[in-house]
């Protein structure tokens, strides 16, 4: 690995939650499952998160906070951490992206990028 940033791989799976959504009220609920894989040689702790969420109307919201789902997990080398969370959009289509602030046991801080991923009601895109 060339850098600490390259040592973290973020994988995302999304799901539209139809039963808790209400299109007539412009409420579309999506669940996302994130897997954070530590490909590096050092254990890292996830300290905080940053999300940029954009819907189909180009409305952008930003979310910052400590940890994820109430935890600040430490991810050992060649290990992964997975969690599930959700978000509500006013449109049936949107994009999320962001970063995690990570720290090594030696106190080195870095940002692990979360690549853009699509939130879409099934059938919205061909």
From Swiss-Prot:
Coiled-coil spans in chain: none
Sequence ranges assigned to domain ApaG in this UniProt record: 2-126
Entry's Gene Ontology BP terms: error-free translesion synthesis
Pfam families: DUF525
Entry superkingdom: Bacteria
NCBIfam families, per the entry: PRK05461.1 (NF003967)
Protein name, UniProt field: Protein ApaG
Protein's organism: Shewanella sediminis (strain HAW-EB3)
Lineage per the UniProt record: Bacteria, Pseudomonadati, Pseudomonadota, Gammaproteobacteria, Alteromonadales
